[in-house]
A protein has these predicted regions:
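Conserved short acidic donor-positioning loop in nucleotide-sugar-dependent glycosyltransferases
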Residues: 73
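Amphipathic terminal alpha-helices
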Residues: 117-136
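C-terminal "lid/loop" region of Rossmann-like NAD(P)-dependent oxidoreductases
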Residues: 39-41, 67-68, 76-82, 87-107
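Alpha-helical substrate-binding/gating segment
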Residues: 6, 22-35, 43-69
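Non-catalytic, hydrophobic alpha-helical segments
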Residues: 52, 56, 70, 81, ...
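Residue-level signal for the nucleotide or nucleotide-sugar donor/cofactor binding architecture
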Residues: 15, 19, 44-50, 76, ...
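Flexible, glycine-rich beta-alpha linker
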Residues: 1-19
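Alpha-helix C-terminal capping segments
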Residues: 57-62, 80-87, 108-113, 129-133
């Protein structure tokens, strides 16, 4: 199974393996600007950990011997994601070799055997996070 930008409770928020959602959450909690690598139009598909686990369970139950791409069907740019947090943004220089589009294409999505819809929406997750942490 291939997982794409999994986010949720207990995600990695610092270091080389940190998720972008986790990095942004950590910045909010520490009252720092959100770091966005220029140009910010890079797109990613973000999938909540509970939706990822549901996909794994479904694959196990179906007992299919295949490769699965587990990702939301909606892409967001990094700048769109940052704006969902309603915080200051700090632009970082572009990185050599930065991927601009989600690695998951429509072809990958159409070839999935497991067809599940994301139950947890990224915007709802972020709104919930902000409402729980606005006094911090």
């Amino acid at each position: 199974m291939y997982f794409y930008n999994v986010y949720g409770k207990r995600q990695i928020c610092r270091g080389d393996m940190a998720t972008v959602v986790g990095i942004f959450e950590d910045c909010i909690l520490n009252k720092k600007s959100l770091p966005v690598v220029r140009p910010g139009s890079q797109t990613r598909r973000f999938t909540h950990v509970k939706d990822t686990v549901n996909a794994c369970i479904t694959a196990w139950i179906k007992n299919k011997n295949a490769h699965y791409s587990v990702a939301s069907d909606k892409s967001y740019s990094i700048i769109q994601l940052a704006r969902m947090f309603s915080s200051k943004i700090k632009y970082l220089p572009a990185r050599l070799g930065e991927r601009f589009l989600s690695a998951l294409t429509l072809t990958n999505l159409n070839n999935k055997i497991i067809r599940l819809k994301a139950n947890i929406k990224l915007k709802d997750y972020i709104s919930d996070f902000l409402s729980k942490n606005q006094t911090i």
